Amino acid sequence: MQALRHVVCALSGGVDSAVAALLLRRRGYQVTGVFMKNWDSLDEHGVCTADKDCEDAYRVCQILDIPFHQVSYVKEYWNDVFSDFLNEYEKGRTPNPDIVCNKHIKFSCFFHYAVDNLGADAIATGHYARTSLEDEEVFEQKHVKKPEGLFRNRFEVRNAVKLLQAADSFKDQTFFLSQVSQDALRRTIFPLGGLTKEFVKKIAAENRLHHVLQKKESMGMCFIGKRNFEHFLLQYLQPRPGHFISIEDNKVLGTHKGWFLYTLGQRANIGGLREPWYVVEKDSVKGDVFVAPRTDHPALYRDLLRTSRVHWIAEEPPAALVRDKMMECHFRFRHQMALVPCVLTLNQDGTVWVTAVQAVRALATGQFAVFYKGDECLGSGKILRLGPSAYTLQKGQRRAGMATESPSDSPEDGPGLSPLL
């Protein structure tokens, strides 16, 4: 008689992971629940939300009659996620710690803990996503050391597991999973991948999981909670006062506490001005923030960017991109934004240029460009450089022309790319 398959499910104390564990139990698996504590702090009201979430996760395990474990990754989170978050802001970029957390904590630290310490056959999370494997195929996966050297042994090459969008397109979370390793993905089950949020809530209500059903959905960065973002950031970074300057006439409109506090597209809080102004560019040398009137100002729109070396879910770039050096696909740089048609151009160093079919609003360095082909999430790369804005192109500004023609730019930098922040 075959032993029960052991699935270790990450529990956050929310409804999605609770229902994921319930569904795994219903499928007849031996399920263990694990709560990860990644941040050690009180919010501004003196409440440690992690403790409450841990209690809720423990109660889920009691209701489902499954073992409960708690692990602390506070140190790993600080080193791999939060330090990166601060470093990116100091550089004037706009990081996405959720993507980095999934890569380093949930699908690395937790994955290895589940497999090595708890003897898991597979892990599971409450993410709305799917893979190209059925459950039984997941259980057949074993760790295979990546072939080394120039030539791969043809018998060691495996078909890559695909990361696919969830059935509920509005709740789809493949954006946040776009940096997950192939090794972890092929041993992961996403029980909610084919369900809608409403149906998940219905399942929770019918199975005595009311305590997680009534909780508000967590949004934003887990370590900030309900706190004011500017106040939070200034606890860790030194204020660097500078000016708000109009992109249209270089007029000084006000002052700010630090250019790193603002991201492109964000409304600038400038005292004394009736009309809203929006951040369109930042000067890292002088510490000035350039702003423009109107939310649809052409200075907010760009159609060209360059990424860091892309993390491909399949571990290799798509065959068409390798063959032709160019490929049509779609991308997004914010969760739930509409997919944007684009053309990728592959560079020798593994980075890509992304040319959007039409200019998009509020691109910012530090964000991740996540690529899609149909339902499949191909992977992602961090945005490191931006092309000129529509406003710059319209004006034909001399400084943009000088940046493009700078002898220090390598040919790899592409047309009109500059390291705008």
From Swiss-Prot:
It is found in: Mitochondrion. The keyword Magnesium does not apply. One of its GO terms (biological process) is tRNA wobble position uridine thiolation. InterPro entries: MnmA-like, MnmA-like_C, MnmA-like_central, MnmA-like_central_sf, Rossmann-like_a/b/a_fold. Residues 96-98 are annotated as: Interaction with target base in tRNA. Its EC number is 2.8.1.14. One of its GO terms (cellular component) is mitochondrion. Keywords: ATP-binding, Deafness, Disease variant, Disulfide bond, Mitochondrion, Non-syndromic deafness, Nucleotide-binding, RNA-binding, Transferase, tRNA processing, tRNA-binding. ATP binds at residues 10-17, 36, 126. Its main location: mitochondrion. Ubiquitous. Abundantly expressed in tissues with high metabolic rates including heart, liver, kidney, and brain. It comes from the Eukaryota. It catalyses: 5-taurinomethyluridine(34) in tRNA + S-sulfanyl-L-cysteinyl-[protein] + AH2 + ATP = 5-taurinomethyl-2-thiouridine(34) in tRNA + L-cysteinyl-[protein] + A + AMP + diphosphate + H(+). Disulfide bonds join 101-222. One of its GO terms (molecular function) is ATP binding. Residues 395-421 are annotated as: Disordered. Belongs to the MnmA/TRMU family. During the reaction, ATP is used to activate the C2 atom of U34 by adenylation. After this, the persulfide sulfur on the catalytic cysteine is transferred to the C2 atom of the wobble base (U34) of mitochondrial tRNA(Lys), tRNA(Glu) and tRNA(Gln). The reaction probably involves hydrogen sulfide that is generated from the persulfide intermediate and that acts as a nucleophile towards the activated C2 atom on U34. Subsequently, a transient disulfide bond is formed between the two active site cysteine residues. This is Mitochondrial tRNA-specific 2-thiouridylase 1. It comes from Homo sapiens.
